[in-house]
Amino acid sequence: MLHTTQLYQHVPETRWPIVYSPRYNITFMGLEKLHPFDAGKWGKVINFLKEEKLLSDSMLVEAREASEEDLLVVHTRRYLNELKWSFAVATITEIPPVIFLPNFLVQRKVLRPLRTQTGGTIMAGKLAVERGWAINVGGGFHHCSSDRGGGFCAYADITLAIKFLFERVEGISRATIIDLDAHQGNGHERDFMDDKRVYIMDVYNRHIYPGDRFAKQAIRRKVELEWGTEDDEYLDKVERNIKKSLQEHLPDVVVYNAGTDILEGDRLGGLSISPAGIVKRDELVFRMVRGRRVPILMVTSGGYQKRTARIIADSILNLFGLGLIGPESPSVSAQNSDTPLLPPAVP
């Protein structure tokens, strides 16, 4: 029997399927500055979209925090109990001083924002199926699996979103994960190792964290990149491999992990993709997936420079300008794009 969740509630048509909460952002006594991740980037993305007059607060879907019962759909109770120790959270978030904080503060200031982003991804999964597309402005914690975290990822939001859909939404039984963050997505790979319903395509720098050889066995389409890969080679490989992926396994939903740590100058990603290249990448993914009438859920994942928030906002603006997203994106897209799009589903 399914547990009662607050994450699968009806959303009025007046709201776009863009999920966000001010509670996403991590700020506490400057500790967030000790990690290269911009722990306030999610709010900056929304502010840029407001400045460009694309969105207002009344058009957004407010993310809810994932409850313990929600998390237990994927996570072991033992793992969730480990997060009650500040040492474990310090290791996962790679912020050593967290060790010295009382765990009630760690829960409130670090883990609650991550649980809220996780709830946002689960909510966006349902919205994607109903509307044809959805974006969680946070999430994409692709290094976390059911029983282990790492790489700033404490909850397995991608796995959770897919499992919620499989369990609760009729007609959703096949999923594809397109993971274009610079790092291998070893968390969801471990979770779906033996699940043939889930097809994983992963494009990543082969030389960097996590280098999880066991998890690589779950990747159905693996594209390993060299240091400093640039736009032309990257976009060509992404386009060709998405096309092949969708031919091999036509899913009922795509989860797109849209990390911006592929950006040139990102010292953790080690690739050399331009801002325009990232915008073009997202356009390619949406055009190819939506052109096949497959719902798409986008999460923002990694991105370790201050300018990534602007790039994410520019990408969302570009998707809107091309008619690939919008309040009535199927009809908008028919006018502005050469790709047929998904009609609105009945909730």
UniProtKB/Swiss-Prot annotation:
Residues 14-326 are annotated as: Histone deacetylase. Keywords: Chromatin regulator, Hydrolase, Nucleus, Repressor, Transcription, Transcription regulation. It comes from the Eukaryota. InterPro entries: HDAC_classIV, HDAC_PDAC, His_deacetylse, His_deacetylse_dom, His_deacetylse_dom_sf, Ureohydrolase_dom_sf. It is found in: Nucleus. GO terms for biological process: chromatin organization; epigenetic regulation of gene expression. The keyword Transcription regulation applies. It catalyses: N(6)-acetyl-L-lysyl-[histone] + H2O = L-lysyl-[histone] + acetate. Weakly expressed in most tissues. Strongly expressed in brain, heart, skeletal muscle, kidney and testis. Interacts with HDAC6. Responsible for the deacetylation of lysine residues on the N-terminal part of the core histones (H2A, H2B, H3 and H4). Histone deacetylation gives a tag for epigenetic repression and plays an important role in transcriptional regulation, cell cycle progression and developmental events. Histone deacetylases act via the formation of large multiprotein complexes. Belongs to the histone deacetylase family. This is Histone deacetylase 11. It comes from Homo sapiens.
